[in-house]
Structures are given as C-alpha cells and as structure tokens.
A protein has these predicted regions:
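N-terminal hydrophobic targeting/anchoring segments and the immediately downstream early-domain regions
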Residues: 1-178, 186-187, 197, 202-205, ...
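C-terminal non-catalytic regions of proteins with extracellular/luminal or membrane-system context
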Residues: 1-19, 71-78, 82-90, 95-98, ...
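Second-shell residues forming the walls of enzyme active-site clefts
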Residues: 47, 127-139, 162, 229-389, ...
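Structural recognition of the beta-strand scaffold that forms the well-ordered cores
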Residues: 50-56, 111-116, 142-148, 152-154, ...
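Structured alpha-helical segments in the cores of large, soluble enzyme domains
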Residues: 97-104, 189-210, 239-242, 256, ...
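Short acidic, glycine-rich surface-loop motifs adjacent to enzyme active sites
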Residues: 104-122, 213, 293-321, 540-564
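Glycine-rich tight-turn/loop motif centered on a GG-T
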Residues: 113-118, 164-183, 214-234, 268-287, ...
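Helix-enriched interaction subdomains in cytosolic or periplasmic regions
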Residues: 223, 400, 408-410, 414, ...
Length: 682
C-alpha cells in the first residue's frame, strides 16, 4: 500500500508535505510562496508525460465500501475485486461498464476524476484518502482533484446528475430559481459545498448557466430558468456559496457550463446525441444567452465547460463549441478575459466503450470527418485545457512529439490546471476525516435547509387548497395530527421537529383514519398523517396525485434517461386525469423538469388545486394541499398552451411561445396563500 508522505518542517519551522520525497522543501512545496511562483516551479519539474496526464479528466467509480484493494492498485471503475457501473453498480461484482486501468495515476499521471457514483460518506472519505495516497507516491506527489455532477437534488441521470447517497436534498436547480431568493440559494450552495468537501469532492461540474428558451430541451431542470436576469442572480449566489468570494482551501470550485449557452437546441434535441448536434438561433439572440455567463464570471467561476453542440446561425465557426476557436479563444478568452481552466464536455474526443452494453460515439459534432489525433489538435488550437472523460494522455504526447502542437501550448494549460489545485489547498492537505464525514453529511440542519428550499420552490398554478382543508375539518374524529412530526426521510432526527417546511394545521381536530384519500405516486407513510388510502377515486373524499411532466420515451442506454419530445399528456392520460378530477376534489402536483403543456388540467374540468414542483418530499406537497401552507414559488419559465405554440417558437428567444397558460414570474397570490383561488392566464 502507498505510504502517506510525512509532514516535515523546514529549518525555519515551516511545515510542508515532502511530495517529491527528497527531505527538502522545494518551492512548489512551500506554502508561504505565491501560487504563481509555486506553479512555475512545479511546471519546470514536470515531464511531457506528466503534463499530458494533468490534461485528462477521467471517470472513477469507487467501491461501495470505500475499502482500498489489497494490492493498492486503482481502477477507474472502482476495482478492488468488485467492478460495477450502470446496470451493476459499485461493489456489485457485475461486469464492468467503464474502462479499467490500474495505473491511471501511477503510470498515466492522470489526477482528475469525475465520480460516477459516491458510496456512503465515511466510505467515500476513505476512498478519497486512498486515491490521494496513490498520488502522493508518484514522483512529484501532485494531489488528485475529485469532481462530480450535481448530487443534491431529485434527478438520477448517469450522464448529468445524481441523487441520494446521503446528501441533503434540495430541489433541482430550476427549483432554486423558483425560490427567487438569492440569499437562500447561497446558503444552500454553501451547505452543499460543505458536504462535498467532507468526502473529498473539490470540483463541482456545475452550475449550468444555460437558459431554458427551448421548452423541449431535456436539460431544463438543471438550469436556472428562462429569465436571464433571474438566472444571473441565481448563478452569482450559487457560485459564491460554493466557492466563497475567492477560491481557497474552504472552496468547492465551480465549472460553469455549457458555454456559450446550451439552451437553444434545434427542435429541443440534446447534444449528447447526434439528433442534437446543432443549435438554432433564428432570433439571432446569442448575446442574450451569454448574459448568465457574464454573471458567473463576475462571481469568480473557476472553470468553464463548453457545450457539445454547433452554434449554428451565430456567425461562429460551424463546429462544436469544444472544437471552436471562435468560442473558446475568441469569446471566452479574448472577449471575456477568462484565464481559468476550460474542460471539454465528456467524451467529445474519443467516445466511450461500455463493454457488453453499448459503444457511445464521440460527440465530435462538426469534426466527425477528422481522425482522433486531428480532433485533438483542433481542440487544443481552440484553447481548451482538459479533455473531459478522456484517459488518453498518450495522444497529447504524440501531438507534441510530432510537431503538431508546441510544448509551450501544453504548458499554458497545465499552468491553469495547477493553479486551481494550489488555490484549493490540495498541496497542503488533500485528505479528509472518514470519522467526521458521516456526521457532516446530511446533518439535521442541512436537511432542514434543503426541505425549506424545496418548500419555497413549490409554485401554485391554479385553484385553492380550501376543499382539502375543509374536508379535514369536517371529518369527525379525535385529534391525531400532531402538527410537526419528524422528517420521514430521517425519522431519528429530532431537529426536524422545528422544520418550517413541515407545517400542518395544528388546530385541525380530524382523525386521519376518517379521511379517505385516493393517491398516486405518494409514499403511504407520508399520506398517513392526513388520511387513509383508498384504491379508487370513487371511494375517496379527496384525491392527491403527483405526476411527472410528459415526455416521449426514447430507446438507448443513455437516451432513455433524457426526457425529450412532446410536452403534452397523451390523450388517454389527459382523459383519465380529468375523470379523476370529475369524481372527487383533486390536487395535482406536476414535476416540471420541463415546461409541460398543462391545458388539459385547466378550467372546470381540471383539478381543484394545481401545483408545479421541481423536486420536493411528499410530505411537503401534502402540507401545501392539506395544511394551508402558502405556495411561495415563482414560475421560472413560461408554461406553453400547446405543442403547436412550442413548434412555432424560436429556440433562442425567451418567452416566445404564443399565449402561454402561465407566464414566467407567476406566483400564487399572497395573503390567504393556498386558501385563495387563483387561475392561469387564459
């Protein structure tokens, strides 16, 4: 097993980590020196192979228990005798679905890894320390940077976001925008960062600065909505919450994406797939999509990821943004003066082989005709610094040795990458405490905060909670509702007794056993606080339904996780929902990961109460329905009236669908809150 380098002391008493194992404090090991001086010293010591490894940002799948393998080897799929991945999972022993290489760190000099899964906090902390020990045993001891897509929401998509794993859940980023409260967003982002730091994750592959101007696009839940000004405010708060006011040892660095704006996808198709290779700018509105990035740069975003797609119709080169010198050098470097790390979106260069399941092509949109070495040279000429998802430093070495790329160009990128490692304090201490990790992740305070953000993001679209609160009051029985039970997701947490997001009506005298509720997609334990479950609407006093926004099911290992296509409920489903509403007073909450067409749920045939949510626990939705808790959220995009209106709108222009049912910025009336009836803009 690797031996952790000891903490030594310089002759003047300065403590340092002896990363190159020579017993002397070299300038790059000296914590007193300016970052730029340390970077220059380390860069001068590196071989071309070591530099090339630093420019690869691979993937990693830790074992489920975080236990290092007996031989000390590292595999990029979490080997320790138990590979796994999509369809298997870490530690399951199923066939690996990610490429393995026990020498990624030691031989290939790769020391950036995006985590494809995260084991429980203590296990993840142990794994981080094992990885850092492996890095410390290399010639120069350059520490590893572990990164991750979002892990604090409700979406589970292996290519874009994750949920669970013990982290405190808030709504999706679109729900953060729905709170319209930058102070609350910054507080939640800071809590998120603290949990990530506790397990060793120091680079966030988020936030998204893209605008939700094309309603069909599958990635809208990861954005801050359609309004560029609101998105800018949210980005400022989120980045400052994650990083602080400057990048240092208390920060989680943010990689803002997908420059210069991924929202205007042609026909709403996502650029992970060939159908979404191009964007559309019929409104010539690129400048509008740059505005949220300007806010991110002003907030100090450390890194940037360009999008896969071709910015067609903008006057920029007709190649994907990661290959596009007009985008990376012209816009990002020269116009905006950005000198941080630019990392390509993942597997834009070589694609990905998933043994036994699928081969995912490179998202090399616009340069498919080029060979892989030619693509690499094009990327480097464009100005990128790291290759997302790639573990092929030999291609970079070959490009330099062939004369296609100068080593000074490689040095410029390595300098940026090293700078962030030093600023994050990784050279001083990349380790975390496994015994403290579990108590620091998912604390009562951060869970309460996450639930508060969830509650604040709920948007009242139409109707009133009055039929449901009345039904509770008029059912005879004993007072069984205690008003503030503990969070059902963390029943041992007494701190949740004060959760302001879990309020009910403490004066309600009804016995839950006497209120018959027909429910769909709601946990029975949460519903038991308010009523007993019945099997059909006809048996019920009231009905409460939680629905996903409509989408078209797609085939394919990854594409099935992307909600794309039509935003309308199929006719049969719309008729079924209206039949439930006709049978009994009904509340419907729709998870708006995209701007759904909710026309069938409006008017007299619709529900008594219609809510838009962006990821919220069942009991919080039920509190809004039964408890009279105000619906405070602000709609972060227009909700269109029809798919025809969507098809006729321009992908790059906000608020462009004709006669939307609800406008961006809609909020349920104040005053009586959920008791007051309100309606769409018909």
């Amino acid at each position: 097993m690797p031996v952790r380098p000891p903490l030594l002391h310089h002759h003047d008493g300065t403590p340092f980590r002896d990363l190159n194992h020579n017993g002397t404090m070299e300038p790059y090991e000296d914590p007193r020196l300016p970052v730029e001086d340390r970077v220059a010293d380390l860069l001068a010591r590196m071989t071309l192979e070591e530099k090339a490894g630093l420019m690869c940002h691979g993937r990693m799948l830790p074992p489920a228990d975080g236990t290092p393998p007996a031989d000390g080897a590292l595999s990029a799929d979490g080997a320790s005798g138990a590979p796994g991945g999509p369809g298997g999972g870490p530690g399951t022993g199923t066939p690996s679905t990610l490429p393995t290489d026990a020498e990624h760190i030691a031989a290939r000099h790769i020391n950036h890894f995006a985590l494809m899964a995260v084991p429980p906090p203590a296990a993840m902390a142990r794994w981080n320390n094992h990885v850092q020990d492996l890095a410390a045993a290399t010639r120069l001891g350059i520490p590893v940077t572990l990164s991750s897509d979002p892990r604090h929401g409700f979406t589970a998509n292996p290519a874009t976001a994750h949920s669970g794993e013990g982290f405190s859940a808030g709504p999706e980023p679109i729900g953060l925008a729905a709170t319209d409260d930058p102070g609350l967003v910054r507080e939640f982002a800071a809590a998120t960062a603290a949990e990530l730091r506790a397990v060793g994750i120091r680079l966030a592959l988020h936030p998204m600065a893209d605008l939700a101007t094309e309603p069909r696009w599958a990635r809208i839940s990861g954005t801050f909505g359609e309004d560029a000004d609101r998105a800018g405010r949210m980005l400022d708060a989120y980045i400052r919450g994650m990083q602080g006011d400057r990048l240092d040892g208390t920060s989680v660095a943010c990689m803002v994406k997908h420059f210069p704006g991924h929202g205007p996808q042609a026909l709403g198709e996502d650029a992970h797939f060939a159908a979404g290779r191009a964007q559309a700018f019929p409104g010539r509105n690129l400048a509008h999509h740059l505005r949220p990035f300007e806010a991110a740069f002003a907030a100090g975003a450390a890194q940037v990821m360009p999008c896969y797609a071709i910015p067609s119709g903008t006057g920029l080169a007709e190649v994907g943004a990661g290959y596009n010198r007009d985008v990376v050098t012209g816009l990002l470097r020269e116009r905006y003066g950005f000198d941080g790390v630019v990392c390509t979106d993942f597997n834009a260069l070589t694609g990905m082989e998933i043994p036994g399941l699928a081969t995912l092509p490179a998202r090399a949109w616009g340069v498919e005709h080029l060979s892989v070495p030619e693509r690499l040279v094009t990327m480097l000429d464009a100005g990128v610094d790291q290759l997302g998802g790639e573990t092929c430093p030999e291609l970079i070495v070959a490009a330099v040795r062939s004369g296609a790329v100068g080593e000074e160009r490689i040095d410029a990128s390595v300098r940026r990458v090293l700078r962030d490692k030093f600023r994050l304090g990784l050279f001083e201490d990349p380790y975390v405490d496994p015994e403290r990790a579990a108590p620091l992740v998912g604390t009562p305070r951060t869970r309460r905060l996450g639930r508060t953000v969830q509650r604040r993001s709920l948007v009242g679209l139409s109707g009133s909670a009055e039929p449901f609160t009345t039904a509770r009051r008029t059912k005879p029985g004993s007072p069984a509702d205690t008003g503030n039970p503990a969070d059902p997701g963390n029943p041992a947490d007494p701190g949740n007794l004060t959760d302001p997001g879990n309020l009910t009506d403490p004066g309600n005298p009804a016995d839950p056993e006497n209120l018959a509720v027909y429910a769909e997609n709601i946990a029975p334990a949460a519903l038991a606080r308010y009523g007993r479950t019945v099997a059909t609407p006809e048996e019920a006093d009231v009905a409460v339904l939680r629905l996903a926004a409509p989408y078209e099911h797609r085939e394919g290992l990854l594409e099935r996780h992307f909600h794309s296509g039509s935003l309308e409920f199929p006719a049969e489903e719309a008729a079924r929902l209206r039949a439930v509403c006709a049978a009994v007073p009904t509340a419907i909450s729709v998870f708006l990961d995209r701007p759904a067409v909710l026309a069938p749920l409006t008017g007299p045939a619709g529900p008594a109460l219609l809510i838009g949510d962006f990821g919220a626990d069942d009991d919080l939705v039920l509190d809004a329905v039964f408890g009279g808790v105000p619906l405070e959220g602000v709609l972060p995009f227009d909700l269109p009236s029809s798919m025809r209106a969507v098809a006729e709108s321009r992908e790059d222009v906000p608020f462009d669908t004709a006669a939307p049912l609800w406008r961006c910025g809609h909020r349920a009336p104040a005053g009586e809150g959920a008791q007051e009836r309100f309606a769409p803009h018909l």
